[in-house]
From Swiss-Prot:
Assembly description: Component of the ClpX-ClpP complex. Forms a hexameric ring that, in the presence of ATP, binds to fourteen ClpP subunits assembled into a disk-like structure with a central cavity, resembling the structure of eukaryotic proteasomes.
Lineage, uppermost ranks: Bacteria, Bacillati, Cyanobacteriota, Cyanophyceae, Synechococcales
Residues at which ATP binds: P143, T144, G145, C146, G147, K148, T149, L150
Alphabetized UniProt keyword annotations: ATP-binding, Chaperone, Metal-binding, Nucleotide-binding, Zinc
PROSITE patterns: CLPX_ZB
Name this protein carries in UniProt: ATP-dependent Clp protease ATP-binding subunit ClpX
Provenance organism: Prochlorococcus marinus (strain MIT 9313)
HAMAP family per the UniProt record, alphabetical: ClpX
Amino acid sequence: MAKFDAHLKCSFCGKSQDQVRKLIAGPGVYICDECIDLCTEILDEELVDSQGNPRHSSESNRKSATASHKSGKPAPTLATIPKPQQIKSFLDKQVVGQEAAKKVLSVAVYNHYKRLAWQGDGQGETDLSATRLHKSNILLIGPTGCGKTLLAQTLAELLDVPFAVADATTLTEAGYVGEDVENILLRLLQKADMDVEHAQRGIIYVDEIDKIARKSENPSITRDVSGEGVQQALLKMLEGTVANVPPQGGRKHPYQDCIQIDTSQILFICGGAFIGLEDVVQKRLGRNAIGFMPSDGRGRSRANRDLQASQVLHHLEADDLVRYGLIPEFIGRIPVSAVLEPLDSQALESILTEPRDALVKQFSTLLSMDNVQLEFESDAVEAIAQEAHRRKTGARALRGIIEELMLDLMYDLPSKKNVKKFTVTRTMVDEHTGGKVLPLPANDERSHQESA
């Protein structure tokens, strides 16, 4: 063996093992440290010629990737952070209803960015006796289409911070097919134009968080790579850690350059419908009704059973989320929770007309580009809201109904030069939602109606 080792030589320059400092073996080939240095220089020269950005080594790549983007936007200060009442007033302009949830969000977001401003002043870093402030992530619970994502988007718009939406259903535990949890941070980084400092003050909304609930209360039954495994992977990110994010996304591997992001200043808002959670709470509230009880006890239990789902969720406790499938460590990192109410017909009517980006205003703006004034009768708005409420998909149903209703209108009106105004009536809505597509009146009839 010693004789064999003495004859080892570099497959590229021919130098023996004794003539070089290090000889690295591959499958049937060898390369010395001098040839490796030469290859590195050649690659660096090519990068300089093609990009005009010299990069000397993989270690310098990591440093430059982390520090190449300095934030051009100033960090928040106590003077610039909007107060909770100001935050709620801004939310009121965009989101209809959900008063309790907006109040919870306003206070939580204000405290979070006040904490960042306090750390930015250096008080929390230089004074060892100062109280350290920890962040409080937020959990939004509510049915589909009730405004969970819109609330988070509106907050990001007000605070002028990067905002990214992630789908928890695509995440899997490391080593399995699917997305790594670090890809969530990559989306935020892309929204911040790859500005690391700016991204570290952003907001991430993790949607469908209820879909990663553990499939069974027994944690040892089977490997749950898209449920409990994802919760475990998210723990450190929610709490605050320095994560290595691949700039191009995808799976991480040991030899790629990564961007380091500190998640301790990122606000995570998790949202989900949590279908069936009210049954878990109801079971706990009505547990005392089993067996022989006084009449007043049975009455209280019967009243609990009669509570609506939204009312039941106001009695939500952490143990209920554990029974639903979230692990205690995960719940502990999302201490602030808010329950959103399902939208009734009256709220859906308001959504159609009141917010800045209301659907009626959007379609009126679209037709105004064709010099046509579009109006909706109040009865028509009411009928659209009632149909959306019947479909039980919340505010998302509104756009679908109006798109279907306006299809023929949007097709014909741009070609009609002498039509300047069109009114959507309840009759049109009723006939459309009843399964009949109402044909548009002839051009001369509409003109006659308009002149009349």
